[in-house]
Amino acid sequence: MLKTTTKLLVASALVAGLSTAAFAKDKVYKWKLATTWGSTLSPFIDAPTNMAKLAKEMSNGRLDIRVDAANKHKAPLGILDMVKGGQYEMGHSASYYWKGKDINTLPFTTMPFGMTAPEQYAWFYYGGGLELMQKAYKRHKVLSFPGGNSGNQMGGWFRKEINSLDDLKGLKMRIPGFAGEVLAKLGVTVTNIAPGELYTSLERGTIDALEWVSPSMDVNMGFHKIAPYYYTGWHEPATELQFLVNERQFKRLPKDLQKILITAMRVAAYDMYIQNYHMNAVAWSKIATDYPNVKIKTLPKNVINAMKKANDELLVEKAKESPLIKEVLKSQKEYLKKAREWTKMADYKYLEDNL
């Protein structure tokens, strides 16, 4: 898919008058991109890697972006600071990792009980979401773009079964973003741990449960070996990663390279979304055949209802923290109301009638 898309994009660039012959002797812009992910953490690491490849090919080598994985720069949760400070021209991470520094950036990854991936992409590109995200990052002098979606994530791996709200009290769990605040309200001790430390933290009992992503990435991390209960999701229905770009460096690029970079980011983001979907489909069947001891569970209805209540209360509180987050949450709520009616009529009804 990526090779075919690259050819189409290059052809489009030529039609637009970006002749590669004219590129030959132009200045080469060498950039660096820092990621939250390790060098083998597919498909997350694939999004920036493919983006850099596309940008280089479409620019005939004029935009050369080196991708540094977390095992090189050693600051997996410091991506915003490094891009903002100019150590890196670009970054690839998840916006909710720095909600403690700037609450306005929180909603752009995903929100509990929120939009699905198609709904959220429609909001970003046609419902005003992208403009709101740029508005949130403007104070950091950073541009932000969708960077690939994991789809609906699983609810996490637990050492013990959750049968009631009492089972959540005192539970130590790694879960980032707004979902962590929801669980904290219900008595969970919440922490955020970098990806490379997740397995050892669960193995040593530093945490009792963790949420990572979905079957393909979770199985590769080996969580099924130490926590047998695997819960369906509620908290991250459309986890969108983010490309971050230093605004000053972006403005220094010629206009054609700016357009090439934006296009490369958009294509790589979509490619990660469908790549991850494929990987999860393969991994799900593998769990059923190779790991029969994994127990697939759904949280009890009374627990889900308590989470929804806590989520609604927290949203009201967050909306009071800044005019911008109030605007973003209002935009998401209004778009979801409109989009969900079509989702129910199209996707849900189709599945209901044909499963």
What are these regions (language model features)?
Residues 25-120, 130-355:
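N-terminal secretory/targeting leader peptides
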Residues 10-17:
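Bacterial N-terminal signal peptides
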Residues 19-24:
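Sec/Tat signal peptide C-region and signal peptidase I cleavage site
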Residues 1-10:
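Bacterial N-terminal signal peptides that target proteins for export
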